[in-house]
Amino acid sequence: MTVTQLSYKDAGVDIHAGNDLVERIKGDVKRTRRPEVIGGLGGFGALCALPTKYKEPILVSGTDGVGTKLRLAIDLNKHDTIGIDLVAMCVNDLVVQGAEPLFFLDYYATGKLDVDVASSVIKGIANGCEQSCCALVGGETAEMPGMYHAGDYDLAGFCVGVVEKSEIIDGSKVQVGDTLIALGSSGPHSNGYSLIRKVLEVSGTKPMDLLEGKPLSEHFLAPTKIYVKSVLELIKQAEVHAIAHLTGGGFWENIPRVLPADVKAVINEASWEWLPSFKWLQEKGNISRYEMYRTFNCGVGMVIALPEKDVETALKVLTEAGENAWVIGKIEALGSGTEQVEIL
């Protein structure tokens, strides 16, 4: 019996397509370059020096994905902003500790590589890196036949930043009397999408149906805000005690992560109005108030704790940086209670 001569391409892996992708994204990657980066794409590992301005540099690392927001993006053939979400989820986690993002790597996996789709995704990643002054130094594109349904892909991101040891923000300085400032979100960001998709399903609503004049898809696929530049500027001009990034777990789980055990955050619900998308979700899904605050950011991307004396400066800095910022609450003694977040 004569066996047909086989190639890797016959097995479903097209090396030439991978090389074509690299060529397409080179210009986008180059725009993210920082002076600390040594060399370019194509090495076995990416090289990056530490910025010389740091006396005791501490590296801060993080990894994340975009959850099932990716499912919605794939279903709607909207690939150009999901990469921004990927970067945002990583760099926002770094900056809350006072860290400046240095470099980013991505992992893109699919059953059959579509160069047009992949390049669109990676252009979005490069866009996010530019917004956060973070170098896209490399990544992995894995073409794995039989592992994914046709048209599907998965994403993960990895980021490393640096902070001066004496300037790490870890919540240890939070004290009774501190003021809480909110930074507005662009929408659900990259959390709660399994529930969002369930609400769409049970309500019989289509993503292209309109909400306040624009398709629901635009509300739900709005890219996650990247707060790096505004928060780093704030840290330079104000005494920041803690920053919480409101991701999975919402208010109830993320704010306590940055609080000492003997205090609580008291949130004034009347200080802001939920975005239309959150009102729609609560109504169409019959979702309880508690569940909304546990699953979604409800219009608040970050919560910052700082002394009352710095509130005016902080609001000015954040507003000038383009943020929607407002006083959302205060820090009080925990007392006899056990809940570290109260929403009144």
Curated annotation (Swiss-Prot):
Taxonomy, superkingdom = Bacteria
Top-rank EC class of the record's enzyme: ligase
Q: What is its EC number?
A: 6.3.3.1
UniProt entry tagged with the keyword Metal-binding: no
| Catalytic activity of the protein | 2-formamido-N(1)-(5-O-phospho-beta-D-ribosyl)acetamidine + ATP = 5-amino-1-(5-phospho-beta-D-ribosyl)imidazole + ADP + phosphate + H(+)
Name the keywords, alphabetized.
ATP-binding, Cytoplasm, Ligase, Nucleotide-binding, Purine biosynthesis
**For this UniProt entry, which segments traverse the membrane?**
none
Q: Read off the SUPFAM superfamilies from this record.
A: PurM C-terminal domain-like, PurM N-terminal domain-like
Query: Where would you say this protein principally sits, based on its record?
Result: cytoplasm
Q: Name one GO molecular function term.
A: phosphoribosylformylglycinamidine cyclo-ligase activity
Please list the GO biological process terms of this entry.
Answer: 'de novo' IMP biosynthetic process; adenine biosynthetic process
Give the metabolic or biological pathway.
Purine metabolism; IMP biosynthesis via de novo pathway; 5-amino-1-(5-phospho-D-ribosyl)imidazole from N(2)-formyl-N(1)-(5-phospho-D-ribosyl)glycinamide: step 2/2
A GO CC term attached to the entry:
cytosol
Q: Which family does it belong to?
A: Belongs to the AIR synthase family.
Name of the protein described by the UniProt record = Phosphoribosylformylglycinamidine cyclo-ligase
Write down the species: Glaesserella parasuis serovar 5 (strain SH0165) (Haemophilus parasuis)
